[in-house]
Amino acid sequence: MNHQLTVKAAQLSHQGPKDSNDDAIGLHLPQGHGIASQTLAVAIADGLSSAEGGRIAAETSVTNFLSDFFATPASWSIKTSGFKVLEALNRWLHGQGQHYHNHHQAHLTTFTALVIRGQTAHVFHIGDSRLWRLRGDEWECLTNDHALSTRHGNQLTRALGMDWRIDIDYQEFNVEVGDIYLLSTDGIHQFIPPKELKAIVASRSETLEARCEELIACAESHHSDDNRSCQIIDIIDLPNNNQHLALDLQKSPPLPPELKIGDCIDDYIIEAELQANARSHVYLVKDLHDHKLYILKTPSHNLADDIEALQAFQREDWIGQRVHHPDIVKTYAPTRPRHYLYLIQEHLQGQSLRVWRKKNPHAPVETIIKFAKPIIKALRALHRRETLHQDIKPDNLFLTQSGCIKLIDFGSASVGSLAENLNLRAGAAEYAAPEYALGIARDGRADQFSLAVTLYELLTGHYPYGNDYKDCTTPKQFRKLSYTSACQYNPHIPLWIDAALGQALSLNPEQRYADLSEFLHDLERPNPHLTLKSKPWLEQNPLLFWQITCLLLLISNVIILFAWLKR
């Protein structure tokens, strides 16, 4: 049985004895299908009442966070989406405050947001609003107040709009069915003791709306002199796990039947079979609607019962439709209903770099280095969307007849928003960075390593760490490996290119380039500092070597002469 994210929620805000309400509350659970509909966002803010822009700051923060968060790229992780939105909000609020000479007109607000996707909660917090959780009989405040207690009351030490920099507390944890969450402003929790808060929130005989009203009334009975706002979220049901959230797709359609030339599938006529292997089948097809040629790709029938492989295929289609870049193969969104599982891509005429290398085993070094620029541009476009390709190799780099390089095949790709709590496997072990074999965190530097292996192979026909590399699975095994200079296999390779490859191929990701643009820079022009580091000491300082050698010979001759004279 498939379970969905199901919650009950209620919220209430009251101005209390004040002339205006500077608090803001909001929640959003999109309707429909896909990953967005399984994401709940709840936000609460308390505008600084001593600042005239406090109310605007609170309302803007809640409203814009709930709208902008769901408008971020689907490939971003929740953490990235939340931070990007809050950084933009903070810049705007801080900028508004700079328009005034009086600090009392600043736009300052506290902010606390709870985002739930699948079985995981994410919390973004700044200021002294609070998030509480009731789990069973355990009542816990999950946030820390960013405030100092003074004789004039609490003084915020952190708030949205206070500084152009922002310091947001972030945490994530598992959610359980039966959890109840309370978000409150200080007009509630500064006046109601924690035990009373717990008793009201835990009152199962009352509706959530009634509990919110009771919290407001209780704060008044405790002489709260501030605005009073609260939100209660009751977790009714959760997905079985996060796996089924991995794609923003409906239930997967069936695999198409075995296709042959002349067959028709959803108004695509099979013109030719281009490739067939254990993983997929690739066909050249003509669209009966626009009469253009396209590539139609389907999973192999061998994978009909392989859920992970079918998800990888869906992920390839999902990513391809959302990444648009001239150096990445175009994947087209459906223009009509699809009755089978397949994807449609642009028709590229040319060959993979694997085939090209077989035909050009002695290609000029500069020709191969020129391939790096479009590949790096494509990878940077992916990385900006928190997407790792994870299968960079000559087979997945396509050289068109016009001389352009296109990055293809996203079947092994990892996406920030989809990779949360998922362990996605990389592609070919010969090209994969050590992080995959060791099971440690990876980032764009893993793709950098794979690209460097690919360039090394195109230049030399060999692998940089030999054939044993793919079998390494432990740190000890990797430590036994040593990098073989590309110059040993191809004497036409300049030392500075070999040095750049060597750094990108460091087994320790911390020793690789921080950014792919730096790698490209060192591939295209000599980096004297890097080349110097990569040379043996003798090559770095030949004059000093011979000076020291002569000095040692002189000393040895003096010693011999002295010993002879003493006889």
Residue ranges and their predicted role:
Residues 405, 417-426:
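Regulatory activation segment
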Residues 1-295, 301-315, 322, 336-342, ...:
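PP2C/PPM-type serine/threonine phosphatase catalytic domain
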Residues 377-387:
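Protein kinase catalytic-loop region centered on the HRD/HxD motif
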Residues 431-530:
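C-terminal lobe helix-coil module of Hanks-type protein kinase domains
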Residues 367-378:
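Conserved alphaE helix
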Residues 324-332:
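Conserved HxN/HPN-centered segment at the entrance to the catalytic loop
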Residues 353-363:
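AlphaC helix of the protein kinase catalytic domain
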